[in-house]
Amino acid sequence: MEVLREKVEEEEEAEREEAAERAEWARMEKMMRPVEVRKEENTLKQETLRDLEKKLSEIQITVSAELPAFTKDTIDISKLPVSYKTNTPKEEHLLQVADNFSCQYSHLCPDRVPLFLHPLNECEVPKFVSTTLRPTLMPYPELYNWDSCAQFVSDFLTMVPLPDPLKPPSHLYSSTTVLKYQKGNCFDFSTLLCSMLIGSGYDAYCVNGYGSLDLCHMDLTREVCPLTVKPKETIKKEEKVLPKKYTIKPPRDLCSRFEQEQEVKKQQEIRAQEKKRLREEEERLMEAEKAKPDALHGLRVHSWVLVLSGKREVPENFFIDPFTGHSYSTQDEHFLGIESLWNHKNYWINMQDCWNCCKDLIFDLGDPVRWEYMLLGTDKSQLSLTEEDDSGINDEDDVENLGKEDEDKSFDMPHSWVEQIEISPEAFETRCPNGKKVIQYKRAKLEKWAPYLNSNGLVSRLTTYEDLQCTNILEIKEWYQNREDMLELKHINKTTDLKTDYFKPGHPQALRVHSYKSMQPEMDRVIEFYETARVDGLMKREETPRTMTEYYQGRPDFLSYRHASFGPRVKKLTLSSAESNPRPIVKITERFFRNPAKPAEEDVAERVFLVAEERIQLRYHCREDHITASKREFLRRTEVDSKGNKIIMTPDMCISFEVEPMEHTKKLLYQYEAMMHLKREEKLSRHQVWESELEVLEILKLREEEEAAHTLTISIYDTKRNEKSKEYREAMERMMHEEHLRQVETQLDYLAPFLAQLPPGEKLTRWQAVRLKDECLSDFKQRLINKANLIQARFEKETQELQKKQQWYQENQVTLTPEDEDLYLSYCSQAMFRIRILEQRLNRHKELAPLKYLALEEKLYKDPRLGELQKIFA
């Protein structure tokens, strides 16, 4: 390194000397030129300067919107506790140990960067990084697992880049300050997340290392959004069906084998060209998506969290990026190296080579060869000594001395100087800063909102794009919470214009999924229901302009399928709706599950009502030991015979095929009863189809009303948002206050001021009792009069001010602006309200004053201290 530095300095010195010589030759040549040439050059230079000034004046500088700065100057440290502003003796000792450790490390590893040991906190006090961690278990069950903790930290805080991307920060703030201002760099993110994970029981560590450009800048534009990744579909292996011995042989293939081979070759060429085109297109897209080379690759400082296996049933080690909350394998290429890591008990330096990023690192912190620790007494067990190393420790005295030496060198980590980390329920519910956060992914944009921030209950929206520039929208997914209509997800496909609504259980119509392109009736739509919440067991209803298909489950009549075909609607002269003028039914097909209580030859599997053709077709279930099923068809005839009588039933009106014919099925009476039963069933089926059409209309009308209202539900335990609970609580508080005033009034002693004028303990005479009574009543009467006069004075004052304002308005009415008129009208309205209230108070006071006077007089007569009055009126 020293040789390379000297070589670079020599080259720079040679370049400076060469530049000085060129400047000297140019000056000499200029002096030797004629005066005219020099004048022309000066003129040209002036014109060039004027042209340059003109062009520069046309340039407008636009200040780019930078990320909000988060520095110590923006933090209010006046209310911080003493532990933030000073160090305890134990912390000072720890800082000395850390400085000594850093000096030894710099001496032994001069090529390594300085250690990140004790940065300054928000009060400019150096604090050891391990004491900045405050293990805390949050009181929210959602924050008990690592994934929810990481997602909360990612959503709650706003990322601020490091001041110098090549160095760790000079300040490391406490987690309480970071939570208060909701901003921080990667080290602040990691400190907060690691504190929460350790409190939840994970073996977590803060890492000081190097990351990729995307990782350090929280750039997810080359990452696929996790919400767009579809789960892998399990491919079921098709079981090979063994050919039966007596199967029918297929007919002989008479097609030309040569033509088939040529067609196969042609198809293979087409597929090869298509595959080549797709490969070229994929390479082009990969080239476009490829990140530009980073000049600082491998040098950018980043901090993240390492979670080791063992605790909380973690099967293997993994990294957590605190910016995004995503987990990564320790082999991931985004993490380029590790300098050191720490938890709340110790500090470790990585002594392994990171030439292959973090792929070859072994995270055995008990191995002092790979991980150099700072403090003894760590909870990580040391490697066991081999037999060769153990041979030198044979004597008991040596073992005792070794134990004493370790005991003397051990040093316990001081307690954290950070206050208890607390997250209020309001902050936990709001999550994102100001309640909103936007994350840009590769071909996708994710927006998040706090619950109840949007009036329609929208909490998240995922927009998927077709191109990398995010201009052509493919689909939109919107997630909702606390909706009264139980709407949970809305999926909009911009390519097909198909909208799909997903509902949670509890909708009035038991909706589960509603797919549609238009809310107009008799259009293509699919409605799925929670069949257990419906009486009829309807699972799904598919509708087109000419058909309606319904699927059932769990019905007592074993109905599983109903398909209705409609004909063109008959035009009417008057205006008609779908309800008053239903579509004519052409055909109804119904299918049934097997009813084990009936024999197969009597259990109908499918029945078809051909309404227009006046035919009914039946197909029965097939017995297990048969390969064919019985069938029957009924013809409804409206003709009359030769005598003019209506034909009820003839043998040709029932065409049947029976696997095992029976005598009673051939009788006309049996066939007649079966046809009459089917006619009733047809009428019932047509009515049910009509009811289904009406139900669709009701659902569409209800959905339009719900979308227009988008009412949100509020829990009865949410006292801040629940208006009914709030009104009830305020009413109870008002009643308690009034009751308190009544108690104070009843306990008020009216005679106390007058009795104080007499000698204590002296018994009142008759004359003194009468005088006290008269004085008390006179004083009370005067107070009632004063109160009436006060109300009257306020009333007159308000009236005079209103009259003056009205007079001013009459004088300046022409020159007033609309804003002045609005202010005048508002003042008049408020003044009239005050005048009316004062008038009501005065009238009420006039009505109640005599009653209060009489009540006090009666109370004085009954007062035991004025017993002489009772003798007078006895």
UniProtKB/Swiss-Prot annotation:
Keywords: Cell projection, Cilium, Coiled coil, Cytoplasm, Cytoskeleton, Differentiation, Flagellum, Spermatogenesis. Pfam families: CEPT76_peptidase, DRC7_C, MORN_DRC7. Residues 1-20, 386-410 are annotated as: Disordered. Residues 386-400 have a biased composition (Acidic residues). The keyword rRNA-binding does not apply. It is found in: Cell projection, Cilium, Flagellum; Cytoplasm, Cytoskeleton, Cilium axoneme; Cytoplasm, Cytoskeleton, Flagellum axoneme. Residues 401-410 have a biased composition (Basic and acidic residues). Residues 1-67, 257-297 form a coiled coil. It comes from the Eukaryota. One of its GO terms (cellular component) is cytoskeleton. The keyword Cytoplasm applies. GO terms for biological process: flagellated sperm motility; sperm axoneme assembly; spermatogenesis. InterPro entries: CEPT76/DRC7_peptidase-like_dom, DRC7/lobo, DRC7_C, MORN_DRC7, Papain-like_cys_pep_sf. Expressed in the testis. Belongs to the DRC7 family. Component of the nexin-dynein regulatory complex (N-DRC). Interacts with TCTE1/DRC5. Interacts with DRC3 and GAS8/DRC4. Component of the nexin-dynein regulatory complex (N-DRC) a key regulator of ciliary/flagellar motility which maintains the alignment and integrity of the distal axoneme and regulates microtubule sliding in motile axonemes. Involved in the regulation of flagellar motility. Essential for male fertility, sperm head morphogenesis and sperm flagellum formation. This is Dynein regulatory complex subunit 7. The lineage of its organism: Eukaryota, Metazoa, Chordata, Craniata, Vertebrata. The gene is DRC7.
